[in-house]
Amino acid sequence: MSAGTGRRIRVVVVDDSALVRSLLTAIVNEAPDMEVVATASDPIIAREKIRETSPDVVTLDVEMPRMDGLEFLRRLMRLRPTPVLMISSLTDAGSETTLAALELGAVDFIHKPADDIARHMQEYAEEIREKLRVTAEARLRQPNRFRQPPPARKTGPGAPLRKNALVFVGASTGGTEAIKDFLMGMPADGPPILIVQHMPEHFTFTFAERLNKLCPMRVKEAEDGEAALAGVAYIAPGHSHMRVAPAGGGGFRIALDQEEPVNRHRPAVDPLFDSAARHLGKNAIGVILTGMGKDGAEGLLRMRHAGAVTFGQDEASCVVYGMPREAFRIGAVAHVLPLNRLAEKVVECLQSQAERAIT
């Protein structure tokens, strides 16, 4: 049931494939707390169905006849803001379009393969239902609210940054835009930033490329064994856990592995934060952003116990206040801040630590 109303979550399914509409309808209607109230084969029909049924969440395919899915999403968010779960193909083009949809206001996405869609969707039926529940309760991002990062900061001679620190970031639902806003506020010459965003394999490379075009720092998908360098933000690949490990000369390197999922995710945030606590202690800064579930909370607590400064995104600016809530609940978060102030405070922390080191 919808947490706010106690009634079933009302879903409208929009997809040009009759098979996908049928599969999603069956998956939704198998759950006692949700129901499909309408389906549509294209955005023109969907517009009328949404107006008639006032759904809690819409599933939306990107590639549809009569109107591009992104254009429909753009209009929907402007005229009748509604939580949207995107349906995306696992291709480079699909990942680029999905990231554009998240930027336009979609809450999350599920991916469908090119072959054997029926078996794949049945295997992930419970994950689809869980994403629908989270999407229905998500806080929609408002235009120009919590979205305007501070201007890119250049550190001058009077504001040195601590050089031996590393910054670690974890996020899930809503995280693609939150990470972008955070990195937009970090200076080009900042310390290495290691980031885990729950995302499939084909999407993380595209995500890193997209951020690299927008942010002051260089942003790239992480590679196993490479040095963690200042001025670079590293995105964990969608198929691997990412950890930090000591390297020669007092530096650090990135270690990737394909061990079992943690908290149902690979990459997961906890392995990254655990490695930061183990190898960096007080030389680490941890940041936990919007996302459902508990991944990262225990690792952030271990970072704090090891001496790291820890930050959590506040409830008001989160799309889904799950991971930061759990981290705050167990005492892992030292500083709670809105998204548009997190980068500023992390930079201030790095500057104050540098000043203390000098004196």
Swiss-Prot record:
Enzyme Commission (EC) number: 3.1.1.61, 3.5.1.44
Modified residues (4-aspartylphosphate): D61
Domain CheB-type methylesterase: 160-353
Enzymatic class: hydrolase
Cellular localization per UniProt: Cytoplasm
Main location per the UniProt record: cytoplasm
Pfam families documented for this protein: CheB_methylest, Response_reg
Active site: S172, H198, D295
Keyword Glycoprotein: no
Domain of life: Bacteria
GTP-binding as UniProt keyword: no
Catalysed reactions listed for this entry: [protein]-L-glutamate 5-O-methyl ester + H2O = L-glutamyl-[protein] + methanol + H(+); L-glutaminyl-[protein] + H2O = L-glutamyl-[protein] + NH4(+)
CDD domains per the UniProt record, alphabetical: CheB_Rec, REC_CheB-like
Xref: Gene3D superfamilies: 3.40.50.2300, Methylesterase CheB, C-terminal domain
Role of this protein: Involved in chemotaxis. Part of a chemotaxis signal transduction system that modulates chemotaxis in response to various stimuli. Catalyzes the demethylation of specific methylglutamate residues introduced into the chemoreceptors (methyl-accepting chemotaxis proteins or MCP) by CheR. Also mediates the irreversible deamidation of specific glutamine residues to glutamic acid.
Record note on domains: Contains a C-terminal catalytic domain, and an N-terminal region which modulates catalytic activity.
Protein name from the UniProt record: Protein-glutamate methylesterase/protein-glutamine glutaminase 3
Species per Swiss-Prot/TrEMBL record: Chromobacterium violaceum (strain ATCC 12472 / DSM 30191 / JCM 1249 / CCUG 213 / NBRC 12614 / NCIMB 9131 / NCTC 9757 / MK)
